[in-house]
């Protein structure tokens, strides 16, 4: 019979640190979250390399068999959102709007078109993150379109 003892030290964590640890993603820190970084590692990339070669990285994520649909779609939603946010000052307005819409598209697919229903992952942090990507991306895209046309759509 083995006997042992363990000591545990408990320390307080600030609200900011807690949120960063639990929620650290493109919306809260400006960097990709751990789930997306893990997905990138499956395709042999990292955040910096992926953003430098966005098209190749995106294609690798879309076509890999090493990720399930939820991992792939949530990572793509976050990547497109990062692309849109990083391009605020350098991207053409239409390209930035397109990036927000791509983020919303992948987030919607994650939320409603994967094998598990939203209720089956209701308490998962990743679903909350992806839902926020969807809401934020749609809001930004609509705001940009409205500002671009000031309520007057382009003629066909």
Per-region residue spans from a language model:
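Long, low-hydrophobicity ectodomains and other hydrophilic envelope-associated domains
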Residues: 147-156
